[in-house]
C-alpha cells in the first residue's frame, strides 16, 4: 500500500527532517526485522532496500547472523525477502572505517539475501 502524496504530507516530511538526528546506532537490523515482519507474504516475492553511509556496530558477523534468523530461507533455499542496499560516500573530513564497514556489511547481506549492493564511490 502506497502512502498518499499531498502537500500536507510533504510539509510534514520536511518538518520532520528539520529535527532529524543524523547520528544513530547505524544498524540496519531493526529496520530489516520490521520490514520482513510487516511485509512478508508467502505468495509474493518482495524486496527491501537499505540506504546508508556507515556502520558503527561492533560486529558485522552478529548483524549477518541476526538477519539470517529473521529472513528465513524456504525449502528451495530462497530467502523470504530479498535485501538490496545502496551505500553513499559520506565523509565528514576524510574516508573512515565506518563507511567501509557499511559496504562490507551490506555487500554480505545482499549476497546472502538474493539482493544487490550498489556502492557509490563519489559525489555527483
Language-model-derived ranges and their functions:
Residues 7-10, 29-33, 37, 63-65, ...:
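Long, low-complexity, Ser/Thr/Pro- and Asp/Glu-rich intrinsically disordered
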Residues 8-46, 57-58, 87-92:
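Von Willebrand factor
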Residues 45, 115-124:
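Gly/Pro- and small hydrophobic-enriched strand-loop and loop-to-helix capping segments
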Residues 19-20, 54-112, 118-120:
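VWA/integrin I-like adhesion module and closely mimicked acidic/polar interface patches used
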